[in-house]
C-alpha cells in the first residue's frame, strides 16, 4: 500500500474557503453508482451516485454529449431495425408480438442489454422523459419475452417454439446464455439506480432466481457454460441492489464451478481453478470479465484466496502482457502457451493473451471489449485498495485503447485496436482496418457506448470523511459523506491537453473533510499549489 500513499496528495477542507488545486419490493438504491460499493464490507473506496456527478466542459464532457446526441440514438435505431441483424426484433418474436425466426449472433441479447444500460445511465444526467418512455416501452417487451420460470434467451426460446430439440436452456455453452443474463442484471441495476423504477430489475431478479435454482449444484457440463462471464459482475451487482444474499452466493458459485470443468482450456480460463491461476491466459475479454467479477466478489467477502491470484495476474498483465495503450489480448489466433495433453492436437486460443512480451503492433488484436474489461477490472481493484496504480491503468485504457474503438462522429467503430496500421500486408486480417457502423460480432460498439455514458462515475470516490479525485476533467460533484455532511465540488481543467486543474469547494458541512488527489503516474515529482 506504500504506492497508494505515494500517489495521492491529501488536503483538508472546511468552509468557508475556496480551494484551488490541481411489484417487487426492493430497497431504494436509486442514486448509487454503476458498481455500488457503498455497503461493500471490503471496499476502501465507496462509489458516488450516478446522479451525484456529471461532466461540465472539456474532453470528457464533449464525448458524453456525443454519446447522448449521436451514439445512443443511432445505435438504438440500428438495434430496433433489421438492416444489419436482429436485436430488439428477437425480443418481439420471443414475446409473441410478431412472427419470425431468430437472426443474429447468440450474444445479441447481451449486446442489446449493454445499449440499454448505456441509455439508462444517460437518464441519470438528462432526465429526458422521451428517452425514459422509450426505455420503458422496450423493457415491457423484454418482460413479455421472459418465460414464467424466469428463463430469458430469445435465440433458444424462438428455436424451441418451432420444435428444435437442441434448443434447451444451458445445453450449449456457445449460446452465451450466462453472458446475456449477466448483462441483463447489470443493465437492470443501472436502470434502477438512474430512474428509481423496478420494471427491469424485476425481470433480472426472476432470471437470477432461475440461475440460483439451476446452478445450486452445478455439474461439470453446466460449469462449461461460463463463457465471457459477465454473470459474475451481474450477480454481485444484483446482490448490492436488492440485498438478497442468494445472488452473492450465485456469484461465488460461478467462480468456484470453473474448477469442475473436465478438460478445461486456457481459452476459457478453466483449465485449472481460478484460485490456482497466476497469469493471464486465453480469450482476453473472457479473462478480464472473470478478473473483474472475482474482484467484485472480493469486495463483498474479503476472501484472500481470490485476492492472491488477482494480484499475481494483475502484475503479469501490466508488466508483460499489456500494450502501452492499456490494450489487452495480442493474438488473433494461436496455441495455448501451456500446450496440450494430446501430442497430436493443439489447444487453440483466439482473441487472446499470448506469451510474456508477445505484443505485436501491426497484428495486435486489442479488442475494444477486452480493453473495457481491463478498465472494469482495475476500477474494482482500486475500490478494494485505494491504490493509485489501478486508476493509472483505468485512465491509460480509457484515453487510448477504449476511445479508439469509436469514431469522432459517434457512428462507426473498431473491433480491434492495433497500434500500427500497414498499408500493405501479405495476408488479409479478419477485421477491418477502418471503422464501420456494424460488425457481425457487435459486442464492442454497445460496450463503448455504455462506458462513455457511465464515464463520470469513475471521477470521484468516498471513504469516511474523505473525497477521492480519481480522474481529471471538467465536472461537478454533489454528494454526502458518511456523517451526512454535504460536499459540493467543481473541477475546472483542460486536461488532458493542459495539466492545470482547479478544484473549487462550493459547499460542505461544518466538519473538515479530506480531499485525496491522484497524482498521475506521468506527473510524479511536479509541484502542486494551494490557494
Please place each PLM-identified region on the residue numbering.
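N-terminal secretory signal peptides that target proteins for export/translocation
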Residues: 1-13
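Sequence-pattern detector for short linear motifs
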Residues: 8-9, 17, 117, 289
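Glycan-recognition and catalytic cores of secretory/periplasmic carbohydrate-active enzymes
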Residues: 31-531
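Bacterial N-terminal signal peptides
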Residues: 14-27
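Generic N-terminal simple sequence motifs
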Residues: 11-12, 23, 69, 516
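Hydrophobic alpha-helical segments and their boundary regions
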Residues: 12-14, 40-41
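Generic structural signal for short, solvent-exposed loop/turn connectors between secondary structure elements
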Residues: 4, 25, 217-221
Amino acid at each position: 500500500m506504500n504506492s497508494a500513499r505515494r500517489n495521492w496528495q491529501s488536503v483538508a477542507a472546511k468552509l468557508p474557503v475556496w480551494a484551488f488545486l490541481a411489484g417487487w419490493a426492493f430497497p431504494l438504491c436509486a442514486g448509487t453508482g454503476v458498481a455500488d460499493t457503498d455497503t461493500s464490507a471490503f471496499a476502501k473506496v465507496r462509489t458516488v451516485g450516478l446522479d451525484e456527478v456529471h461532466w461540465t466542459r472539456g474532453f470528457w464532457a464533449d464525448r458524453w454529449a456525443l454519446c447522448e446526441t449521436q451514439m445512443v440514438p443511432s445505435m438504438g435505431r440500428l438495434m430496433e431495425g433489421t438492416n444489419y441483424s436482429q436485436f430488439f426484433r428477437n425480443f418481439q418474436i420471443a414475446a409473441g408480438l410478431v412472427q419470425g425466426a431468430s437472426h443474429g449472433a447468440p450474444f445479441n441479447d447481451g449486446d442489446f442489454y449493454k445499449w440499454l444500460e448505456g441509455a439508462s445511465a444517460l437518464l441519470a444526467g438528462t432526465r429526458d422523459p422521451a428517452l425514459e418512455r422509450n426505455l420503458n416501452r422496450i423493457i415491457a417487451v423484454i418482460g413479455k419475452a421472459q418465460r414464467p420460470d424466469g428463463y430469458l434467451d430469445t435465440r433458444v426460446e424462438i428455436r424451441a417454439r418451432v420444435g428444435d430439440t437442441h434448443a434447451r436452456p444451458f445445453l450449449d455453452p456457445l449460446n452465451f446464455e450466462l453472458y446475456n443474463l449477466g448483462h441483463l442484471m447489470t443493465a437492470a441495476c443501472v436502470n434502477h439506480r438512474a430512474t428509481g423504477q423496478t420494471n427491469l430489475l424485476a425481470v433480472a431478479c426472476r432470471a437470477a432466481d432461475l440461475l440460483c435454482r439451476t446452478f445450486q449444484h452445478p455439474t461439470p457440463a453446466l460449469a462449461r457454460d461460463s463463457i465471457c462471464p459477465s454473470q459474475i459482475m451481474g450477480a454481485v451487482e444484483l446482490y448490492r441492489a436488492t440485498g438478497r444474499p442468494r445472488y452473492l452466493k450465485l456469484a461465488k458459485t460461478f467462480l468456484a464451478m470453473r474448477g469442475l470443468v473436465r478438460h478445461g482450456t486456457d481459452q476459457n480460463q478453466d483449465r485449472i481453478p481460478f484460485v490456482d491461476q497466476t497469469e493471464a491466459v486465453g480469450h482476453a475479454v473472457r479473462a478480464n470479465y472473470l478478473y473483474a467479477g472475482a474482484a467484485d466478489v472480493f469486495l463483498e467477502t474479503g476472501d484472500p484466496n481470490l485476492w492472491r491470484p488477482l494480484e499475481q495476474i494483475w502484475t503479469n498483465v501490466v508488466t508483460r502482457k499489456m500494450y502501452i495503450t492499456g490494450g489487452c489480448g495480442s493474438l488473433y489466433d494461436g496455441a495455448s502457451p501451456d500446450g496440450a495433453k494430446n501430442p497430436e492436437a493443439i489447444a487453440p486460443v483466439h482473441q487472446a493473451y499470448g506469451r510474456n512480451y508477445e505484443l505485436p503492433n501491426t497484428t495486435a488484436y486489442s479488442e475494444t471489449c477486452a480493453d473495457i474489461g481491463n478498465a472494469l477490472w482495475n476500477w474494482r481493484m482500486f475500490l478494494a485498495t485505494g491504490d493509485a496504480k489501478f486508476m493509472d491503468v483505468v485512465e491509460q485504457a480509457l484515453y487510448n485503447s477504449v476511445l479508439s474503438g469509436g469514431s469522432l462522429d459517434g457512428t462507426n467503430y473498431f473491433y480491434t485496436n492495433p497500434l500500427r496500421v500497414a498499408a500493405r500486408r501479405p495476408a488479409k486480417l479478419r477485421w477491418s482496418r477502418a471503422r464501420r457502423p456494424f460488425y457481425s460480432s457487435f459486442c464492442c460498439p454497445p460496450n463503448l457506448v455504455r462506458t462513455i455514458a457511465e464515464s463520470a462515475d469513475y471521477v470521484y470516490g468516498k471513504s469516511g470523511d474523505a473525497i477521492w479525485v480519481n480522474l481529471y476533467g471538467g465536472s461537478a460533484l454533489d454528494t454526502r459523506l458518511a456523517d451526512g455532511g454535504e460536499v459540493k465540488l467543481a473541477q475546472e481543467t483542460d486536461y488532458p491537453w493542459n495539466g492545470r486543474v482547479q478544484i473549487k469547494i462550493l459547499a460542505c458541512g461544518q466538519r473538515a473533510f479530506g480531499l485525496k488527489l491522484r497524482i498521475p503516474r506521468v506527473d510524479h515529482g511536479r509541484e502542486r499549489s494551494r490557494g
